[in-house]
Design a protein with these regions (language model features):
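Active-site helix of classical SDR
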Residues: 76, 112
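Residue(s) in the substrate-gating loop at a strand-loop-helix junction
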Residues: 96
């Protein structure tokens, strides 16, 4: 926001919980009041609780599904009239690399993020030719507060890159009307291909690291 303001842009900060109907309505109203219209919606809110499914509470499961899947769908629905009025608008859904390669101890999070990815794909086709494009972003491990309690490193498939790198790639995707932005480099691309062509091999690879991964992510929570 500071960089945008220094560059001459108009910036307005809004504090709201988009996981609630009131928060979504407030966000949209204040954005429209401040900007006079809407050209882009970026669904970037997220929450996670890692761990075995049977050790994850119902409230934690519902919270992840709400903030990672339901809230973006409902906020997009509410924003569509303003986006259509723009004539050339975009919805950007920030999902996760786990939406492409399911990882143990992230079953609900993977389900929510994969659901958001397919929502974006379907909506892109629904809105084709109507002035609203949809971009789906798949970050790899990103150095944000959400990852503070995740102790898994690159040896377990959890590398880190600066949030600024993901932001720059997302901006490039917006400027080029891309369908997808997938982070993680060639290593991630190879794993995606292997998961598609030989999922059993990925199962075996993850089996070998499962004990270490479970220990490393047991406290990973950002809800």
């Amino acid at each position: 926001m500071t960089s945008c303001a220094r560059g001459g842009g108009s910036v307005a900060g809004i504090v709201a919980d988009v996981g609630t109907e009131e928060g979504r309505a407030l966000t949209l109203k204040r954005a429209l009041d401040a900007l006079g219209g809407l050209d882009i919606l970026i669904n970037n809110a997220g929450g996670v609780r890692a761990g075995r499914l049977e050790a994850t509470s119902q409230s934690e499961i519902e919270a992840m599904l709400n903030v990672d899947l339901v809230a973006p769908i409902l906020l997009t629905r509410a924003a569509l009239p303003a986006l259509r009025a723009s004539g050339s608008a975009m919805v950007v859904n920030v999902t996760s690399g786990i939406a492409l390669i399911g990882a143990p101890f992230y079953a609900t999070y993977a389900a929510a993020k994969a659901g958001l990815a397919r929502f974006g794909e379907a909506l892109r086709r629904e809105l084709k030719g109507e002035g609203v494009h949809v971009l789906t972003v798949y970050p790899s491990g990103t150095d944000t507060p959400m990852m503070k309690t995740n102790r898994a490193g690159p040896e377990l498939g959890f590398g880190r890159e600066p949030a600024s790198a993901v932001a720059d790639a997302t901006i490039e995707g917006i400027e080029t009307d891309a369908f997808e932005v997938i982070r993680g480099g060639e290593t991630r691309a190879q794993m995606i291909a292997l998961n598609r062509d030989n999922p059993a091999a990925v199962d075996e690879r993850m089996l070998s690291m499962k004990p270490a991964l479970e220990e490393a992510v047991k406290d990973h929570s950002a809800l």
